[in-house]
């Protein structure tokens, strides 16, 4: 078949394509036999791999460090899901809790989703340093992947992140 679409694999924050081990990224990419394969870098997911991050500037530095560690493999990053989520303190607290999960499937599922949304918040970047991140990676596809509860909140968050991309400090 002569497919023309890009096949992009998104990094996650659980074992698999975490973008923290270049040898694993290389291994995964080598098993995909398609010319237009690549990576969709979710910045928030990569941030979850470092529980010590305290600021957006630290997060941008961390992401750039991980991209640099990938060397030539970084050229496979064709897209970005741009968002930030600095939740290491929450995760550290969660890890130490001994609370049992509900045994009822529906209640357990609800509890899991609540934790996931506390960890993976999809907030806008507000630091102008994010401009360097996007300029370094030069993605073909850039998605402002932001979570909101309505159109007006989404617009506010989008305006904030776009301002940061233009170098404005919020």
Residue ranges and their predicted role:
Residues 18-22, 47-139:
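Gly/Pro-rich active-site loop or hairpin
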Residues 11-15, 43-47, 84-86, 148-150:
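Active-site-proximal loop/turn and secondary-structure-junction residues that shape catalytic pockets
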Residues 2, 27-32, 69, 132-136, ...:
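Alpha-helical structural signal in soluble globular domains
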Residues 88-91, 150-154:
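Short active-site-adjacent structural elements
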